[in-house]
Amino acid sequence: MFYFISRKFYDQFKYGILTDKTNKLLKNNVYTFDVDIQMSKRQFKDLIETAFSVKITSVNSYVKSSKYYRSNNFEGMKKYYKRMFIKLNDLETIPFFSCL
């Protein structure tokens, strides 16, 4: 069962975000993730709650638009992505981020 959850988790989950701004949010127990563009808030909430065994109080998200870039003679666009912010209860943490 855990293999199925972790396989599903890694298919839709891109990576956790660790920047200066997100480190400030970690003090308020808010975690930041980049996910698949088609994932909904409810799906993400259920996925995180089952994968890490935590209780989520709120989920916020936004879609970052793509940007144009040019390198020598090549022009293209960067991919757009969805960023999710989750807030946990005060007593709970996600083990991966707690060691940072």
From Swiss-Prot:
It comes from the Eukaryota. Disulfide bonds: none annotated. GO terms for molecular function: rRNA binding; structural constituent of ribosome. Keywords: Chloroplast, Plastid, Ribonucleoprotein, Ribosomal protein, RNA-binding, rRNA-binding. Its main location: plastid. GO terms for biological process: translation. InterPro entries: Nucleotide-bd_a/b_plait_sf, Ribosomal_uL23-like, Ribosomal_uL23/eL15/eS24_sf, Ribosomal_uL23_CS. It is found in: Plastid, Chloroplast. One of its GO terms (cellular component) is ribonucleoprotein complex. Part of the 50S ribosomal subunit. Binds to 23S rRNA. Belongs to the universal ribosomal protein uL23 family. This is Large ribosomal subunit protein uL23c. It comes from Euglena gracilis.
